[in-house]
């Protein structure tokens, strides 16, 4: 048997939602791929149609390159995030610089992702959504992030959160509110709202968040995607618990 073609259910669900929502509410998410000339438009469609495992399979088969996928994600972020405001810090250069060092046998092969701005990524600003931490740059990544990168994920930036993750809406004085991609007048939920909005808008196929009392699940339900609270001891232990 050949490799299974992984096309995520959530993409089908979101496309169905798009047909029932007004164009003004969807703007600027709706039509971004068709508005981009080929080959960028083609890569944008692949970014939307495949989940992380499916994109990794395309990269492994040399149908596309990891750099092309990462650049397509960067293009989409540049096009949409002024309105959605999902990211607090971009790490595009860091991701592109690390791509050549991604081992060829990793699970994710350089697939792009994002990390909630509540977790240490070495050399990248971590603010906790607070003006108090705008100058905080950790020297070392937590074990969870190291495991993500060993698995071949390319981190493109940090995602917005309410200050110190203390709320079910993503809004703070430092960066402002994160809008729901399906209706920009509504909030993405919280506290992992930046990550949920980024996935729903098609920036990346998956993003990291934290969840103690619904912080992944609430924004996921607001944005129409899957959000998980991992069981204890089923992931790398440490701060990301």
Predicted regions: what they are:
Residues 10-13, 72, 95, 236, ...:
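Generic low-polarity alpha-helical segments
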Residues 168, 196-241:
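Fold-level recognition of mixed alpha/beta catalytic cores in primary-metabolism enzymes, strongest
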Residues 2-21:
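N-terminal secretory signal peptides and thylakoid transit peptides that target proteins
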């Amino acid at each position: 048997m050949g490799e299974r073609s992984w096309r995520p259910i959530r993409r089908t669900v979101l496309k169905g939602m798009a047909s029932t929502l007004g164009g003004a509410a969807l703007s600027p998410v709706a039509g971004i791929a068709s508005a981009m000339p080929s080959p960028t438009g083609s890569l944008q469609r692949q970014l939307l149609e495949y989940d992380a495992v499916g994109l990794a399979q395309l990269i492994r088969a040399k149908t596309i390159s990891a750099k092309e996928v990462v650049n397509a994600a960067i293009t989409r972020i540049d096009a949409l995030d002024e309105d959605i405001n999902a990211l607090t810090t971009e790490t595009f250069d860091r991701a592109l610089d690390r791509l050549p060092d991604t081992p060829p046998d990793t699970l994710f092969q350089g697939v792009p992702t994002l990390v909630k701005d509540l977790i240490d990524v070495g050399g990248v600003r971590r603010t906790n959504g607070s003006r108090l931490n705008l100058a905080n740059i950790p020297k070392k990544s937590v074990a969870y992030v190291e495991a993500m990168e060993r698995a071949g994920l390319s981190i493109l930036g940090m995602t917005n959160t309410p200050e110190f993750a203390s709320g079910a809406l993503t809004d703070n004085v430092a960066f402002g509110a994160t809008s729901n991609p399906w209706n920009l007048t509504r909030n993405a939920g919280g506290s992992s709202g930046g990550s949920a909005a980024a996935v729903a808008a098609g920036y990346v196929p998956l993003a990291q968040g934290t969840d103690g009392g619904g912080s992944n699940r609430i924004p996921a339900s607001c944005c129409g995607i899957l959000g998980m609270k991992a069981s204890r001891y089923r992931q790398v232990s440490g701060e990301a618990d």
